């Protein structure tokens, strides 16, 4: 189910589409993201979804090898960060943003997403802090949210994983 809107920022109008992708395989979702940004969309899209159990390995992790046959599978990806577990009960937000149409520099993207998420989480009564050394949001020393982004041809993709009701044991 998708919803869309137009938001005014200064003199700019930004088209923004939110899409609930439900439960979707990580590789299928990645292919959809890449297909979308290849079309050079004018506006922005934010997808929210869950993945069946999977580990994704970002470009900062050099030791762990891809193993699609392991349980859960391990996939190398081109996002920033190290290794992240995704599973049912974790809400993933993917941000496909046209960075030519944002009021901030591409280098500020990750910090803007984390700051906005931190405020939203705090508004729900959950005191949290942002870590610079291991980017994400922490509550009482436990990681609540991880972030890993990639920018290609002025478009962002990948995003933020928020642990809601996931078994991390």
Label every model-predicted segment:
Residues 6-144:
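N-terminal lobe of the biotin/lipoate ligase/transferase fold
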Residues 1-4:
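Compositionally biased, low-complexity intrinsically disordered regions
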Residues 59-66, 73, 144-164, 168-169:
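Short, conserved beta-strand/beta-arch hydrophobic-aromatic motifs that form part
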